[in-house]
Every structure is written in C-alpha cells, then in structure tokens.
Amino acid sequence: MTRSLVWGASLLAIALVLPNASALAHGFAGQRFFPATIATDDPFVSDELSAPTVSTIRNSGEGGGQEIDTSIDVSKRITPNFGLGFAETWQHFSNAPSGFGNLELSAKYQLLVDAPHEALLAVGVDAEVGGTGARKVGADRFSTVTPTLFFGKGMGDLPDSMKWLKPLAVTGTLGFGFPTRASTVTDPDSGDVERHSNTFETGLAIEYNLQYLQSSVQDIGLPAPFNRMIPLVEFAFSTPFNRGQNGLTTGTINPGVAWAGRYFQLTAEAIIPANNRSGRNVGGVVQLHFFLDDIFPTTIGRPIFQ
C-alpha cells in the first residue's frame, strides 16, 4: 500500500471510531443553512446531486482556446454520518481534442454538528483515479489521494449589537495531496522527467445568507427571489511543497451568488485567476444542485443504514 493510501485509510479509521455527530440533511447546523459550494467542498454529509456544473474559460498561453467543462457530482449517505461520492467531467476544447477527465471518488465522515454555535466539522478523503480519463485531454496516468478536513461556522451566536453580521458564515477545507507517482518520464529518448509534487490544498468560502437575515435576524422586506439569495466568494488554492516546486501556488477567486430553494439550489460564480501562474483570463461557472434528501426523503434520499 502506498504512503498516500495509508494516510487516507488511517484518517477514515480515526473518524469511524469517534462518537457520532447529530447529522442533518444538506448542511444545517441549528438555524444555519450552509449552501453547496462549487470551488470548495462542503463541510457536511448529505444525499445530493450536482448536475450539471458547467464552467468556461479561455486557456492562457500560445494558441490558448476556449475550454468548457461539464461535470456531474453525486453524494450518497451510507449512514447518517458517513457518505461516499463520485464525480466525472467532460472537457471540451475549441482547438484540441475533447474527452473525459479522471474519475474522482470521495468519502466523508461528519465529526461535529453544533447547533447552538452553528458549527460543522467533517473529515474525508478525495481520490482522483489515474488512468480513468482520456490521454488526449491530459488526464494523469497516476492517482492523487487527498485527506481533507472540512469546517463551517455561522455567526448567529454573535451579540445582538452585531446583528447585521449574524447572516455571515465561513466554510473551508485543509488538505494534503499525495500523488501515487513521484515522477513521469515524458520523453524516453531525452530522458525528460515531469515531477509530481505533494500539495497543500486550501479552500475558503465567505457567505452572507439573506434568508437567514430575514428569518433569524430582522425581516427587512426582501421580495422573491432576493429573499433566498446567498452572496458569496470562494478562494481555492493549491501549493506544492517539494520536488522542485516549493511555494508555486495556483488558485482562483470565485465571487458569485447562490439561490437556495427547498429542493434545489442554483449558483453562478466568476472564475478569477489568483496570480499569473493560474492564468490571465476570467471565466465563469454555473451549477444546478439537487437536495435528494428533501426530494426523496423515504427512498434514495435517506441513509442506507439508519
């Protein structure tokens, strides 16, 4: 077993022996609803379907063309606190061959749901399965395993003197990416080698929930559809820390807005490169997200084992 798989297995083993959290459907902690986010993963376990998520951006560099990615993401609770998921993406390029990227698998365990303090904590493992995508779109032949800590905190427990800050919430992720191969020979004749670094994966989302403002702070008379909107901004970064790539951070900043109903959520965000290494062009992404635990509460939207 590789070191990265040992890390992932150990992390899940620790989670499974901890006391159960009082998990609730799709991201509630007390009165706080945490929306599904696109660039950073959610700090909760739920039955949900993102279909589709469509992003578009013009790639930087010589001959850079338009890239349109269309993905599907499914999460399923096995127990009230433990869930599995998978995701797949079709990558379309305006000036290059198109195809599927690598399959992505995930497991997540809910460690904490603190209703009075509107806090969530979860631990999980994500894996990009090498060799499952098309070579023509540059899908890696090696896998990458990323043990991750997920957290969320609403500001509803602030004093009433700060009531206008109560609708604020933050969610985030802290993870380490471990490729199963340290390097790949890209040209057998010349012996050129591409090195695959371990990475520090960080994400943060800052949200202001207008529905929370209306229902739990003060009704200011917002009409539909604004009374269910959640303005937000996401930050997602990847920082290599060995094999000659130390500190070469890449990432994006994604400002946008989500609209959350009872059964689904619609989100639109800009994709802004965080630095020159991340690109020079601004793109966009939209996502339609379904709450399967509310749509099918007695069948496919409930945990397999109660």
Question: What does each model-identified segment do?
Answer:
Residues 1-10:
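Bacterial N-terminal signal peptides that target proteins for export
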Residues 14-23:
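C-terminal segment of classical bacterial N-terminal signal peptides
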Residues 24-306:
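Transmembrane beta-barrel domains of Gram-negative outer membranes and organellar outer membranes
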